[in-house]
Amino acid sequence: MNLVVFDIGGTSVKYGRYQDSAIDKKGSFPTPKTWEEMKENLHRVFTELSDADTKGVAISSPGAVDTEEGVIKGFSAIPYIHNFKIIDELEAMFGLPVTIENDANCAGLAESQFGIGKDSKKSIYFILGTGIGGAVCLDGKLYKGSSLYGGEFGFMIIKDGITLSNLASPVAVAKNTLKSMA
């Protein structure tokens, strides 16, 4: 199966072509400031990487992905990707099926099935990037909870309304360090 794959992050979008169980033609571009710019970049990369054998597009993204509604809910460092029928819009643009899942869930699921957690019935995965995310896997399947926020450790309130991401993500630590040195 051939897919064009994207990993949408707060600072960059990584991409590649999944073909024959491997990813090739890898690259990245800075995360755009607007949804229109994002679509232009995604379409450009898709055009470069896809061929007649491409069956779909797979995307990992921040936020609480509601696959039934086709919407990325919640909040992230990329506010313009939330709270609209993003999957429908992307499928219309690419002309192929699109699957989106939370970035930490993608990483956690891969670890639970192929990595360090493959011999465990329960695993927890933390991801540190622009924010802090995570995933909970039970019996090799994602646990999202009733509100899709299972594993979203970055939203935990630590003190006085400050979240774990606001306090301890790599970006927050760098900002706080620079602020304290000024």
Show where each model-derived region lies.
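Short secondary-structure boundary segments
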Residues: 1-13, 84, 88, 121
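A generic structural signal for well-ordered alpha-helical segments enriched in polar/charged residues
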Residues: 44-48, 92, 179
